[in-house]
């Protein structure tokens, strides 16, 4: 325990050693049917991927900042990696500000005429073309289905912000052209 305690002190993390009886009590509380929790015992550190475009955005991704600060290793993956079948090599996938509908995100209304936003649109169109798609929305639907298959295969998915809505909209719009 001493190595872990020293590491916590160095990082400014408060920790407490508990007895087996205390651990058992905590587990019993978690296993109550009216509690929305579960116990997950990690046998190994999960291999984490963060789905994010390769070009920098003006807003920060809080998750990559937190992972970097905590010194938790992760890889950044985007459409090329997903389309190449790399997702099953990861245990965990994180989605954040992505727009899986091909409508270029929630920032379109305010930032569509900004140079950095136009560059982002052009980059997405270029990636779609490179991967053989006529439209970004077609690429993003295929990416969404690959993410769905990753989860169905046992992968963990954590989505937040606009990724949650746009992921569902993308799947719901299958066979419907929702983009000009």
Where does each model-flagged region fall?
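Intrinsic-disorder/low-complexity accessory segments
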Residues: 1-151, 166
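An acidic, glycine-rich "communication" segment
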Residues: 28-29, 156, 160-180
